[in-house]
Amino acid sequence: MSAVRIKKGDTVKVIAGKDKGKEGKVLSVNAKNHTALVEGVNMVTKHAKPSAANQQGGILHQEAPIDISNIAYSLKGKETKIGYDFKDGKKVRVAKATGEVID
């Protein structure tokens, strides 16, 4: 498997699957399973019983993890690959399409 170059807080675009074309913010990344949780993407329905934490219970809609290979970093509405470069002795992420430093 390749390295995970997507980080929490990045804006990504879905490039494959049922939500293809949607954009969202990365809520969390699981490098071990090669998945990411993206806001508003890959929504699933959960049926919750009433409990101390959830008095009413009922049907909940929440995000499910999506494979990293199905998302791409979105820079100004266009998807791009991410590479690494060294600037002033520090390793930084760079958009391969434009050469722009991401962080």
From Swiss-Prot:
| One cellular-component annotation, GO | ribosome
Establish whether keyword Cytoplasm is in the entry: no
Give a Pfam family name. KOW
Q: In its keyword annotation, does this UniProt entry include rRNA-binding?
A: yes
GO MF terms listed in the record are: rRNA binding; structural constituent of ribosome
Any GO BP annotation: translation
Identify the PROSITE patterns for this entry: RIBOSOMAL_L24
Assembly notes? Part of the 50S ribosomal subunit.
State the similarity comment.
Answer: Belongs to the universal ribosomal protein uL24 family.
Q: What does this protein do?
A: One of two assembly initiator proteins, it binds directly to the 5'-end of the 23S rRNA, where it nucleates assembly of the 50S subunit. One of the proteins that surrounds the polypeptide exit tunnel on the outside of the subunit.
According to UniProt, the name of this protein is Large ribosomal subunit protein uL24
